[in-house]
Amino acid sequence: MESNVVYKGESLELCEDFIDIGYMAENVEVTDSKGELKEIKRSHPDKSMTLLISFPHGQEGFIDEILKIDELLHHIQVDIHCYMIFDGSFEEQSVIKNRLKKFEVVLDTEDEFGSMYGTKLVSGSLENKLTKSLFLISKDGAVFYLEMPSDLEKQFDLERLRIELNKAYASYTGVGCHG
């Protein structure tokens, strides 16, 4: 995983720790739209998947991309917990929250997502913001698919996300590796 990303020609550095495909995802504490702490769990009793997506902010070109992703996931017919994560100082939360159908908007006020998933930017004009990232966590709590563009202006590959969602859903048997 690269430790640098680019946004509008500026090189930005990511924190050193990161989580990769195949690793067990981490539970993280965030703040919901009511200002209450909430734990995002890596796995759920109903065996649903989890999708964690972060952006540095919800302005400019990012809002259009956020709405496209939300529209795609709104039409997915399997249970999936979807979280749109921004840093703790994000102020446009209610504007975005009111436009989303599938995602719950949360803030990384405890700095757990940024630090544990390696999405925290530690230099440049977006210092202490979250980089653009997408983590698909399978039903068993492992990171199944990860996309973290090295150029923040590059959009997520939604066709690939659709394929990975299907693979993650179909590949889980519920019996473990010794079953």
Model feature map: region roles:
Residues 1-179:
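Chalcogenol-based redox active-site neighborhoods
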